[in-house]
Amino acid sequence: MSSGIILLIVAIVLLVIIAYLVGVIIRKRNDSLITSLEERKQALFALPVNDEIEEVKSLHLIGQSQTSFREWNQKWVDLTVNSFADIENHIFEAENLNDTFNFIRAKHEINSVESQLNLVEEDIASIREALNILKEQEEKNSARVTHALDLYEKLQASISENEDNFGSTMPEIDKQMKNIETEFSQFVALNSSGDPVEASEVLDRAEEHTIALGQITEQIPAIVAKLEDDFPDQLDDLETGYRRLLEENYHFPEKNIEARFQEIRESIRANSSELVTLDLDRAREENTHIQERIDSLYEVFEREIAAYKVAAKNSKMLPRYLEHVKRNNEQLKDEIARLSRKYILSETESLTVKAFEKDIKEIEDSTLAVAEQFGLQEKPFSELQVTFERSIKTLTNVESGQMDVFAAVKDIEKIESQARHNLDVYVTQLHMIKRYMEKRHLPGIPQDFLSAFFTTSSQLEALMDELSRGRINIEAVSRLSEVATVAIANLEDLTYQVVQNATLTEQLLQYSNRYRSFEAGVQSSFEHALRLFEVENDYQASFDEISYALETVEPGVTDRFVNSYEKTREHIRF
C-alpha cells in the first residue's frame, strides 16, 4: 500500500477513536445529568406533601376553605399522577437515547425534563404554601372561635355560680345569654354555608356581646348588694337607733324622720326595679343619692348624741358657774360701794357692774331652770347645747370683765397712799431746791426758773388740796401726781442748768481778763455778758456771749471749763 492510503487509514482510525471518546464523554455527562434529574424527581416526590394534606384534611374545613383545599389537593394529585409519570417517561427516553448515542435527542429530553421539574417544583411550593396558609388560617379561626366559646362558657359558669347575687337582673341576663348563644349558632350556620365574611362578623358581635355582658355582670353584684343588703341593714340600724333615742328622751329639730325612712325604702325598691334594664350608671348614681340620704340621717343622730354629751356636761357646770359669777358680782358691788364712800370713782365701773348684773339676771331667768331640769326637757340637745354654750360664753365674758374692774379698783387705796408719800417727798425736794439756789448767792434768779418753781409749787398745792377732800377723786389724784412728778424732775434739771450757767459764766468772765486789754471783741463781749449776768440775770445768754468771744481767741477753752465743772459739781442733797 502506498503511504498515502496508510495515512488515510490511520487518520480515519484516529477520527473514529476520537469520535468514540467524545461520544463516551458526552454519554457520561448525560448520564450524570439524567441521574441528577432523577434525584431531583425523587426529592420532590419525597416531600411530605401527602402528610401536610392529611393534616389539613383532618381540620374538617368548611366553606371557602374547604373549596380551596380541594383545588390544591387536586393539583397535587395531578402532579403525582400525570406530571411525575410524564417526567419518568422522559427520563427513561433520555436514557435510551443516550445509550444509543443519540445525543441531540437525549439532550432535548434532558432539557424537557429539567423544565418540567422546575414547573413541578414551583407547583409543589405553591401547594405547600397554600396548605400552610389554610392550616394557619384554620388554626387562627379555630383559636378565635375557641376563645369566644371559652369566654361564653366562663361567663355562663360565673353567672350560674353567683346567680343569687344578680337580684332582679337575672331574667335580663338570661335573655342576653340566649341572644349570644343564638349568635354563635348563626356563626356556625354561616360558616358551614360558605359565607366566612358574614360568619366572622357574627362571631365578632357574639364575642363583643359576651365581653360586654361579662363586664356588666362583674359590676351588678356590688350594686345589688347595696340595694338588697347594705341599704336595708343601714335603714334597720337607723330605725332601731331612732326608736331607742326617742325612748331616751331625745328630740330632733327635723320632724320628718319617719317619712324620710319611707322615702329611702321606696327609692331602694324603685332602683332595684329599674336595674333590670342594666343601666348601671343610672343605678350607681341613684345608689349614691340613697347613701347620701342615709348618711344625712346618721349625721342627724350622731349630732344629737354628741350634743347630748356636751349639753349634759354644761347643764351641770352652768348653775355652779352662774353662782360663782353672781357671787363675784356681789363682792365687786360691795367693794365699789365701800370705796365710793371715800373716793369719787369713774362711772364706768358702776355701769359695767350693772351690765354684768343684767347679763347674770337674763341667764338666771332664761337658762338656769332649763339646766337644772335638763333631763325633763323636750328640746333637741343640739339646741340646748347652743343655749348653754352661749350662756357660758356670756358668763366667761362677765367674769373677765369683773376681773378687769377689780384690777381697776383694787389699787385705789395704794394710789392714794403713794400719792401722799410722793407729795411729802416733792415738798421736801422743793424746799431743798430753794435752799440750794439760795446758797449759790446769785445776783438774781432767772425769770424762767421762778416761773417753773412757782408752777411746781402750785401743782403740789393742787395735789395737796385734792388729797385733803372728803371724797378723793382718785383719777384727779393720779393725774396730778404724774404732773407733779414730771414738774419736780424738770425743776431739778433747770436748777442744775441755771447754777452751771452762772458758775461757768463767772469763771469765763474772770478768765477773759487776760484778753480784754488787747482783744476789743473780748472786751465788748465781757461788758455785754456782765450786764446780762448782773442786771438781767440771764445766765444762759451771758454764758453764750462770753464763751463765743473766748472761743474766737482760744478755741476749746469753753469745753475745758465745762468738763472741769462737771467733775466738781455739787449736787442737791434731798
Curated annotation (Swiss-Prot):
Residues 102-141, 274-350, 459-520 form a coiled coil. InterPro entries: EzrA (IPR010379). The keyword Cell cycle applies. GO terms for cellular component: plasma membrane; septin ring. The chain crosses the membrane at residues 8-26. It is a single-pass membrane protein. It is found in: Cell membrane. One of its GO terms (biological process) is septin ring assembly. It comes from the Bacteria. Keywords: Cell cycle, Cell division, Cell membrane, Coiled coil, Membrane, Septation, Transmembrane, Transmembrane helix. Residues 27-574 are cytoplasmic. Pfam families: EzrA. Residues 1-7 are extracellular. Negative regulator of FtsZ ring formation; modulates the frequency and position of FtsZ ring formation. Inhibits FtsZ ring formation at polar sites. Interacts either with FtsZ or with one of its binding partners to promote depolymerization. This is Septation ring formation regulator EzrA. The lineage of its organism: Bacteria, Bacillati, Bacillota, Bacilli, Lactobacillales.
